[in-house]
Amino acid sequence: PFWAAVATQAGRLLRLQGTVPATQVQRRIMEQYGERETVSRRARYVLRSFLDWGVLRESGSKGIYSQGDVVAVEDLRLIAWLAEAALYVRPGGSGPLKELMAGPSFFPFRFAPIRADSISDASSRLDVFRLGLDEDLLMLRKKNRNE
């Protein structure tokens, strides 16, 4: 969950202002996890990993990062796996498919268009429920949630 929280804050900042100031990410993470030096340090380590992987880039100013490489994800099994990982950090283990796949924590990825039923076909650990004409709810299968 910690990595997802840092990725979410970085993705939100990229959408809002186009840059990711490390101090803002650290402050927001400390609001969630407590004002301890270890929280701030670990957030910095996660950001450094994002830099090492190329999904964030150094900008001209120290401690301010910009969008790096965006990875196109077309493999349905990989999309299902990433969706499942995102569900594990959500309370209740469920969420609307569109919201989930467009979430800020997935800022390094561009997903191929997918249908909800194809995700459940790609993973035996996910269920899909239709909520309306154009709304699908993705959930972790019950037997999986306590493992």
Question: Which role does the model predict for each range below?
Answer:
Residues R27-T38, K98-I114:
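Short helix-coil junctions and helix-kink-helix linkers
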Residues P1-V20:
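A glycine-rich, hydrophobic loop/mini-helix early in the fold
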Residues E58-E74, D136-L137:
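Accessory beta->alpha helical hairpin/"wing" motif in late/C-terminal subdomains of nucleic-acid enzymes
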Residues L140-E147:
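Long, low-complexity, charge-rich intrinsically disordered regions
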Residues R36-S49, P108-A122:
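Short amphipathic alpha-helical interaction segments
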Residues F2-W3, V70-L97, E147:
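Short, amphipathic alpha-helical interaction segments positioned at domain boundaries
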Residues Q24:
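Ca2+-coordinating acidic residues in Ca2+-binding motifs
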Residues L51-S61, S123-L133:
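A short, conserved structural fragment
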